Amino acid sequence: RSYATKISRRFAKDTFSVSAGLSYQDDEVDSGVPGGPALGIQSKRTPELMLGLYRMLDAYSSVSFNLTYGRPKGYLSDPYKQIGATETLFPGDPLLEQDVFYLYPENRPDKRDTFTAYLEGKKYFSELEGSLETSYRFFADNSDLQGHTIELKWLQRVGEKIVLQPLYRFYKQSQADFYNITLDGTGISPSLQPNGNTPYYSADYRLSDLSTSTFGIKITYFKTQDLSFDLSLDRYLVKGRDGVTDQRVYPDAKVMTLGMQWEF
């Protein structure tokens, strides 16, 4: 379940606006997945506070800026993710001693502070019948994870009914302070069940030092004023940057999306 409210005020003949919003998301996470911690249904609650500014620079260009603070709380681990640790059985016994690699559920903090800043600019070029949209997004949380996203998008009208949207997006992030590919050498003794308390640990590659590039194009066909169809093709490339995580865990993807929008 999610709830949201927003207020907005316009100034300078509607060319400048200030907005503020509050949202609350109440989720339930089923931890009883195969290989998961089997803690049953766990709660996850995410309140967010947003402040936004919008400025129309002229008839063809605008800029907007948003700040968002969130504080997720509850079960924040991923029940599908595990981390390994090597343990020695029967140490000192010349016949029975052996190393065994065990898997444990990850253990993330049960509280998180997130900060997001988003800057977007739009410019319409009348002679080309197209517009350029550029944006930059900064994200950070209290586990030292920082992310930077740059996106460029061109919207080109072709005739009266078709719009082409080529896109490029680049994302780069630093790793969370509790990310490790294994627990070997960390001195951490994992618990059998995640509890949200220290020590924290996760081998989820999405928390590692990585970069991604997305190349895409979208074609929208406006059948009528109220009905449109679209086709998107995206190429998604991911690269690990820590020199430790196996590159094979980073997924590349080709994605095709079909859509329809009907307003009534």
Give the positions of each predicted feature:
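Transmembrane beta-strand segments that form the barrel wall of outer-membrane beta-barrel proteins
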Residues: 1-5, 18-25, 130-140, 235-236
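General secondary-structure edge motif
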Residues: 33, 45, 101-102, 134, ...
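Short, surface-exposed basic-aromatic patches at helix termini and helix-loop junctions that form
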Residues: 6-12, 155-156
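Solenoidal tandem-repeat scaffolds enriched in leucines and small polar residues
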Residues: 13-90, 94, 106
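Face-selective signature of the C-terminal outer-membrane beta-barrel domain
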Residues: 61-63, 113-119, 131-135
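Outer membrane beta-barrel transmembrane domains
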Residues: 66-122, 140-151, 155, 161-256, ...
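Outer-membrane beta-barrel channels and translocator barrels
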Residues: 11-14, 56-60, 126-128, 159-161, ...
